[in-house]
């Protein structure tokens, strides 16, 4: 009896439909007739209050558990009119119960199949229900109501079980076979109830988990949005700071590069400037020395030739004894050897110079030695420039100084001076006749004179030492120098002549071109004048212009002749 009343209470509507399809109509009629006892008054009151108390929940939710109170009410209403019939037909019902109990055993596997289908359908319906109701509060309320309904359903079941037990105690007429079967039936009913409760709990657990996940997701979404907003704000705050830092770093790097470039340029500029100055200074004295050597190489040869000619005349005119002449000749040979030896030391072996010119070259060296201890490097460079640019002192000044500052000289030296006097005279004449000497050279000579006064004594000592050493060398080199000097002089003269000829030719060509232009202009003028004469009668002005034309041509020819004479 208890089993007949518990099945329609716990099984939902979906399972009832499946059971109806599986079970035959004869069985359903038997089950309806097997309900002799109605629900007690307490169960009926609870169902009424349950229907009145939760109308909203039945409207909102589509949970399969909401159909349970309606089913219970239907079952409660069914036994009302059947009460009298069941009381009349008790012995018939007992027989039917025995038959049902025998048939119940094969129907139990069908009930298990229905439960498996129910388990598969229930989670799908629950998922649809959760998708429709997204708000967590409504879902929590629905769960609470469902649990309350289940508890309410279990309470009348327990009451109903108690009533069944009382009825069984009051019915002593039941056969012994039935009484032995009742505890077994009770055990089966309890096992089924436990299974159903366990299934309901299993269905509720995924619902609670899904709700919990939904709540977590909803809580996490605003938190993630807040975190994103905070990160975005932080990035916005940090971006200007990063930009400023980058700009500052770039500016500092650019300044460092700019300063490095300036320092490099400043360090290179003085080096380049010094290099240029040194290069110019090194080239200027070389050019100046080359010019001096070329001039000096030409002058001493002429000077030596004139000396030899004058010495021969003096020997013929003198009536002194032969010993005196021998001494003079010996001294003259020694002097010539000294001159040649001294010229070799400062200059190349091909160049021929006088001893006085050698002294002039030694004087700046001594002067530089003194200045190196007194002045700095800059003054040394300036002095070197001056020394290279200065021209040699004239020969007259040296001769006069030697006469004044050498009173202790022997008679032989006096005779040498008397022989040098005509050379000095010739030097004067050469200086007077040299057109190439400029005012700048004279100023340099005047600046060069005080330096010679300082190194006179040292030069005398050097002359005596060089005199002894140069005797053996000069005799061998005289002939070679003479031949080489002539060849060099000839080559230099030829080169100079060629250069002068080229310049003159160019000048003549330019002048010829200018003359031709002037002639063309004159011809044009004459043609214009003729045209004017034809149109206008002749006047005094036109007559004056005609005799002037040949005069211009004459002046041009005279200028050409003068220029050619100057070139020659």
Swiss-Prot record:
Origin species: Rattus norvegicus (Rat)
Compartments (UniProt record): Cytoplasm
Keywords: Cytoplasm, Keratinization, Phosphoprotein, Repeat
Role of this protein: Part of the insoluble cornified cell envelope (CE) of stratified squamous epithelia.
Region annotation (Disordered) ranges: 23-499, 517-568
Name of this protein: Involucrin
Repeat keyword on record: yes
Post-translational modification: Substrate of transglutaminase. Specific glutamines or lysines are cross-linked to keratins, desmoplakin and to inter involucrin molecules.
Subunit structure, interactors included: Directly or indirectly cross-linked to cornifelin (CNFN).
UniProt record similarity statement: Belongs to the involucrin family.
InterPro entries in the record: Involucrin2 (IPR009733), Involucrin_CS (IPR019743), Involucrin_N (IPR019571)
Biological processes per GO annotation: keratinization; keratinocyte differentiation; regulation of antibacterial peptide production; response to UV-B
Bias type Basic and acidic residues, positions: 49-77, 89-106, 193-213, 266-333, 345-456, 478-499, 517-532, 551-568
Residue positions where Phosphoserine is found in the record: 472
Keyword Repeat among UniProt keywords: yes
Main location: cytoplasm
Top-rank taxon: Eukaryota
Record's GO cellular component terms: cornified envelope; cytoplasm
Pfam families given in the database record: Involucrin2, Involucrin_N
Tissue expression profile of the protein: Keratinocytes of epidermis and other stratified squamous epithelia.
Record's compositionally biased regions (Low complexity): 25-36, 78-88, 107-121, 133-154, 172-181, 217-232, 457-467
């Amino acid at each position: 009896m208890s089993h007949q009343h518990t099945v329609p209470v716990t099984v939902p509507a979906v399972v009832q439909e499946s059971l109806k399809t599986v079970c035959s109509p004869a069985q359903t009629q038997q089950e309806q007739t097997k309900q002799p006892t109605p629900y007690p008054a307490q169960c009926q009151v609870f169902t009424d209050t349950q229907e009145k108390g939760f109308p909203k929940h039945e409207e909102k939710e589509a949970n399969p558990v909401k159909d349970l109170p309606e089913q219970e009410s239907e079952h409660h209403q069914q036994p009302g009119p059947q009460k009298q019939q069941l009381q009349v037909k008790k012995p018939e019902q007992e027989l039917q119960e025995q038959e049902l109990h025998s048939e119940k055993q094969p129907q139990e596997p069908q009930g298990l199949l229905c439960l498996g289908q129910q388990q598969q359908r229930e989670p799908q319906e629950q998922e649809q229900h959760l998708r429709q109701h997204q708000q967590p509060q409504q879902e929590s309320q629905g769960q609470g109501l469902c649990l309350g309904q289940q508890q309410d359903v279990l309470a009348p079941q327990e009451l109903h079980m108690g009533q069944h037990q009382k009825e069984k105690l009051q019915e002593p007429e039941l056969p012994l076979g039935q009484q032995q079967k009742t505890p077994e039936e009770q055990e089966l009913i309890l096992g089924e109830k436990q299974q159903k409760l366990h299934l309901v709990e299993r269905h509720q657990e995924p619902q609670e988990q899904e709700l919990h996940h939904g709540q977590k997701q909803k809580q996490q979404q605003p938190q993630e949005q807040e975190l994103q907003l905070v990160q975005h704000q932080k990035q916005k705050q940090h971006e200007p700071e990063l930009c400023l830092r980058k700009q500052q770093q770039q500016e500092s790097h650019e300044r460092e590069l700019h300063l490095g470039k300036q320092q490099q340029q400043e360090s290179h500029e003085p080096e380049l400037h010094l290099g240029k100055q040194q290069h110019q200074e090194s080239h200027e004295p070389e050019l100046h020395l080359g010019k001096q050597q070329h001039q000096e190489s030409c002058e001493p040869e002429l000077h030596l030739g004139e000396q030899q000619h004058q010495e021969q005349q003096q020997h013929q005119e003198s009536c002194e004894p032969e010993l005196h002449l021998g001494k003079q000749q010996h001294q003259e040979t020694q002097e010539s050897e000294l001159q040649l030896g001294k010229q070799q030391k400062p200059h190349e072996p091909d160049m021929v110079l006088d001893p006085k010119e050698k002294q002039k070259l030694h004087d700046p060296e001594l002067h530089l030695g003194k200045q190196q201890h007194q002045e700095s490097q800059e003054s040394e460079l300036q002095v070197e420039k001056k020394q290279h640019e200065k021209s040699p002192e004239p020969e007259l000044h040296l001769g006069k100084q030697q006469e004044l500052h050498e009173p202790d000289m022997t008679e032989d030296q006096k005779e040498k001076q008397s022989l040098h006097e005509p050379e000095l005279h010739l030097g004067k004449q050469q200086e007077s006749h040299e057109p190439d000497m400029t005012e700048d050279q004279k100023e340099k000579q005047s600046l060069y004179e005080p330096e010679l006064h300082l190194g006179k004594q040292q030069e005398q000592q050097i002359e005596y030492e060089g005199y002894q050493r140069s005797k053996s060398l000069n005799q061998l080199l005289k002939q070679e120098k003479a031949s080489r000097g002539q060849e060099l002089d000839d080559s230099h003269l030829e080169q100079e002549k060629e250069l002068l000829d080229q310049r003159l030719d160019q000048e003549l060509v330019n002048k010829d071109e200018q003359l031709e232009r002037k002639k063309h202009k004159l011809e044009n003028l004459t043609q214009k004048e003729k045209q004017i004469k034809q149109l206008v009668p002749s006047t005094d002005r036109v007559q004056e212009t005609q005799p002037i034309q040949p005069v211009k041509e004459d002046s041009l020819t005279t200028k050409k002749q003068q220029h050619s004479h100057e070139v020659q």
